[in-house]
Amino acid sequence: MARDFPLERVRNIGIAAHIDAGKTTTTERILFYSGVVHKIGEVHDGAAVTDWMDQERERGITITAAAISTSWQDHRINIIDTPGHVDFTIEVERSMRVLDGVIAVFCAVGGVQPQSETVWRQADRYSVPRMVFVNKMDRTGADFLKVNKQIKERLKANAFPIQLPIGAEGDLTGIIDLVSNKAYLYKNDLGTDIEEAPIPDEMKDEALEWRSKLMESVAENDEELIEIFLDKGELTEDQLKKGIREGVLKHGLVPVLCGSAFKNKGVQLVLDAVVDYLPAPVDVKPIQGVLPNGKEDIRPSDDNAPFSALAFKVMSDPYGKLTFVRMYSGVLSKGSYVMNSTKDAKERISRLVILKADEREEVDELRAGDLGAVLGLKNTTTGDTLCTTDDPIVLETLFIPEPVISVAVEPKTKGDMEKLSKALQALSEEDPTFRVSTDQETNQTVIAGMGELHLEILVDRMLREFKVEANIGAPQVSYRETIRSSSRGEGKYARQTGGKGQYGHVVIEMEPAEVGKGFEFVNKIVGGTVPKEYIGPASNGMKETCESGVLAGYPLIDVKVTLVDGSFHDVDSSEMAFKIAGSMAFKDGVKKCNPVLLEPMMKVEVESPDDFLGSVIGDLSSRRGQVEGQSVDDGLSKVQAKVPLAEMFGYATQLRSMTQGRGIFSMEFANYEEVPRNVAEAIISKNQGNS
């Protein structure tokens, strides 16, 4: 089957931004003007094509990265609309990994907002060329040039306007294209009647000034153009387009456009710019990978190269399990067998589809540069490489951030336990930032994710898609107990109930052990006061008592016990009697050894703009945190602290609120430390049922 579009005329792009900047509305207008949909769907009406999950339509936010194919000016454009909420950062991350170019949407009023910085950093991580659409120019307070300045200063990007708005706020009537040096005036509300006209007299001077600056900026990136510009003092439209494109591909220039997607102004010009300036698969560096012998290799964007693709998303839907793939090289055919080189497993390609949000079109093959989905894969998960068995390669995978919040989950009815397990397995296959584990001590199922909204929506999906009602609670903190002093303990177990009785007697010395030793047992019995066969059971009795502690039922750690004396009975002594005696001696001794409660301490690192440094440190201190270090570099502050795990629940939400969404943090286990007396008393009282 021949190609519908040559690779040079394919664009794989993402639309990404801060929440509420108008990404999904922009995508909807692109689909409308390019003929994919014949009626405009609005996000606030719950009718957007790319927002096809129930929760997306209810909440008016984009949760999953919806992939859509359309065409414009004889080019195939594959678009991914990504969420702007920080809880769904993996959707942006995996999109950036497989895209060739990005349209970053900014609000003309809000400008560079918190999530825009995060998205920009993600695009930087994968070196994705980009252009900017300053949206919502119809809103009160819209300021195109101010936003352009913010992008330059806060994102350190060489952003340059290639358009100017004619009017603003309620009077946005058209757009000046500085490249063609023409004005485009909108004559109807639907944005379909556009008049190409000369630049209005009152804006000629401003347009001339910005066009001259644009020519100069473009020429600086190209030796050939700088000579022409110095010789003739200007560049032609074609030369400007060539220079802008080169600047975008080399990451030396970010063209900035303007308009209002909601008011149907500027979107067709955005599509023109995608075709003119963003890269085709052949314009970006070939994908790198590792061969079975450990050597690095590349796969060029070429139908004739060995097949390779990256699975960047797995989704369960009513039609079955869909695996989204980015084709990097070769051809993938329906019915063929391929290798999952990441897992060293063979896979069969049952069906292939390209998507238009929740609609799909079956195809016989996918080719280099395509974004599509595969049905029938059993072992493939996000980040896996698919390739030919003859030419195996493992492609660079994607960065998967660690979850930052966790909660306990259980089904509302015991009969739903199996359904809950299946739901959790399916959801964790789809989303690599959603982790499921079982707490070995509490036996609770614990789910972890990127934020409270993330987990809330996953629990909601369990109900809608898997018909499982679940109770959600805070996870139990894994406290521990230990001792701070030494003492002796004695346990004597004697029972006589007719016939053979029970008798066991041990004397022990207890003391704190080295940190990390857990339970340490030493036998110092001499003279056979306790026969050898009873020493093991006595030790086991103590060890088992360790598992449930003496203060609040938590495991006792770092305790050294020395068996020093005891007695036995020739007839009545037994292993069980000595096991019970060992437990009694342990409980007797530990009460006299100043037992204390320990809590897990977490190593926390917080990164935020330095404006929020004081708030971040103050908040960590209020959580019983100990600040261990801080630094400020290029407007960004980093704080290192040790904070009790018990105080970190809800921190992701608090940090986001405190830093306007611009703070990020990482957290890992450090060590156990003693719980302050007042906190310990409350925990012990609660666990003993006195609360």
Curated annotation (Swiss-Prot):
Top-level taxon in the UniProt lineage: Bacteria
Gene Ontology terms for molecular function: GTP binding; GTPase activity; translation elongation factor activity
Entry's localization field: Cytoplasm
Any one of the GO CC terms: cytoplasm
A biological process term (GO) from this entry: ribosome disassembly
Gene3D superfamilies: 3.30.230.10, 3.30.70.240, Elongation Factor G (Translational Gtpase), domain 3, P-loop containing nucleotide triphosphate hydrolases, Translation factors
Chief location bin: cytoplasm
Entry keywords, A to Z: Cytoplasm, Elongation factor, GTP-binding, Nucleotide-binding, Protein biosynthesis
Residue ranges of domain tr-type G in the record: 8-282
Residue sites binding GTP per the record: 17-24, 81-85, 135-138
HAMAP family: EF_G_EF_2_B (MF_00054_B)
Family: Belongs to the TRAFAC class translation factor GTPase superfamily. Classic translation factor GTPase family. EF-G/EF-2 subfamily.
Protein's job: Catalyzes the GTP-dependent ribosomal translocation step during translation elongation. During this step, the ribosome changes from the pre-translocational (PRE) to the post-translocational (POST) state as the newly formed A-site-bound peptidyl-tRNA and P-site-bound deacylated tRNA move to the P and E sites, respectively. Catalyzes the coordinated movement of the two tRNA molecules, the mRNA and conformational changes in the ribosome.
Protein name, entry field: Elongation factor G
Species in which this protein is naturally found: Prochlorococcus marinus (strain MIT 9515)
Phylogenetic lineage: Bacteria, Bacillati, Cyanobacteriota, Cyanophyceae, Synechococcales
